[in-house]
């Protein structure tokens, strides 16, 4: 309801919304079909549904692993295939997968979530090559996010003693939204959002074993994923199997607004590469000119 209201406030003449379990492939396909029937086609499709379980792997049940996989990974597959059914017929469109730095590097206490994001990354790689071969007009992008301040952490399933949080630094949802919009418009293979995403990927590439021990022995891997507030088990509800207060508009903001960042210099650099390249060339030219004209000249 909130998203529909905001779309209308921004000038949308008609808005269509659905509540659907993305683990149900048929239901997702019906949403895509109805959207095409109503509006005449699909231009952009964004896969963003996610659930998680905060706990050591041995405390997560087989059913919980299965549910996280069904929503995060298979939900992405279902959404992508539903969109492709229409986009391939038209020969154009844009699909954006909302990923995570954890698609490349798993962390403690989120094994189910990390595994599902790794699976999405593999699916993305395979499908993108297939589309470039058979239907290059359909663009496929993946946006790798850092920690984002959404309500998810107030209703995630957890067996931790204190309120869960994403590993800081935490960014505002608007940072993620700008990245997804840019990816939908430009169609890059991948877009890394935030310095932490780049650092995580680099560390895992260069020193994965050292990173294992760092996460195991420092607060980053364990204490940093919890606040100081104890969980009241008598009132805590999670959304692993069903939505929490589905009739209420929870908005996009979580409880970490006081500490979240509303800008990402790394994202700005990634989305302004021509300007950055031009600036580097200009600085290089100025320095070269200064060095040339400042160098001592021999007498004739």
Where are these predicted regions, by residue range?
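Hydrophobic alpha-helical topogenic segments used for membrane insertion/localization
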Residues: 269-295
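Active-site helix of classical SDR
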Residues: 80, 116
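The beta1-alpha1 cofactor-binding region of Rossmann-like NAD(H)/NADP(H)-dependent oxidoreductases
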Residues: 19-30, 62
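A glycine-rich helix->loop->beta "capping" turn
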Residues: 12-14, 34-47, 53
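SDR active-site lid
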Residues: 130-229
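Residue(s) in the substrate-gating loop at a strand-loop-helix junction
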Residues: 100
